[in-house]
């Protein structure tokens, strides 16, 4: 097999820099990382200096993802020799157990890490990832709640918990998680949109009014958010037809729905469709949105 350096006429320095760029971008192009990284390790390890260790880690994770356990094990052994007893290396061992579906061994290893260092967030998150991989959402929810008791500012964890509650159809708790996120990220249109979707799914006049409000807020933050625009149309339409709504509320929401429909129509026209095609496309969208439910992004 041709070497990467010969195939693409690149130097080892360029290959090293490419690996760094992929790390910084958190790229998951595992096949390319394995190809470039394996050549760096085999041919240029002596030239890489201290960069070799982060490259071993990077290549190992990519190798697990790519199904190259032989390469992953080689990298892990090199890291163990250099950093015996390191929690970071132990976590990599746990990730290899996960790739081999030795979930119990991985959980035990992460538990030992946490006994020695209760603040090790990486080990906690790996445990949660295992529960999710096993389809044990209830246990994953419990683990995440325990984690958030100690690390309340972890926004990624709050969003992950919201997604798990949505999967379990516990919309009230999902809404609470998203409220926490909106408090710290008031300008994030996606959080506003997802909160609106949760409220829409819960149903009832009060929730529908909140849904419409937050779909509108999502649009205010990003006027190109078509999902929020569809949501605004549907929530306003449902409020307008709700028998518990006052006459004024119905009238106002008919206006909101009409405005949203006109914006959707304009968006279709702007996309280059003819008026006839737009009419039928919009009708199809409206029919689809009659069954609007939360879907995973």
UniProtKB/Swiss-Prot annotation:
It holds the Pfam family TPR_EMC2. Changing residue 61 to K: No effect on transmembrane domain binding of tail-anchored proteins. Transmembrane segments: none annotated. GO terms for biological process: protein insertion into ER membrane by stop-transfer membrane-anchor sequence; tail-anchored membrane protein insertion into ER membrane. Changing residue 200 to A: Decreased interaction with EMC5 and EMC8. Keywords: Acetylation, Endoplasmic reticulum, Membrane, Repeat, TPR repeat, Ubl conjugation. GO terms for cellular component: cytoplasm; EMC complex; endoplasmic reticulum; endoplasmic reticulum membrane; extrinsic component of endoplasmic reticulum membrane. It is a peripheral membrane protein. Ubiquitinated when soluble in the cytoplasm, leading to its degradation by the proteasome. Interaction with EMC2 prevents its ubiquitination and degradation. The modification N6-acetyllysine is found at residue 255. Belongs to the EMC2 family. Part of the endoplasmic reticulum membrane protein complex (EMC) that enables the energy-independent insertion into endoplasmic reticulum membranes of newly synthesized membrane proteins. Preferentially accommodates proteins with transmembrane domains that are weakly hydrophobic or contain destabilizing features such as charged and aromatic residues. Involved in the cotranslational insertion of multi-pass membrane proteins in which stop-transfer membrane-anchor sequences become ER membrane spanning helices. This is ER membrane protein complex subunit 2. It comes from Homo sapiens. The gene is EMC2.
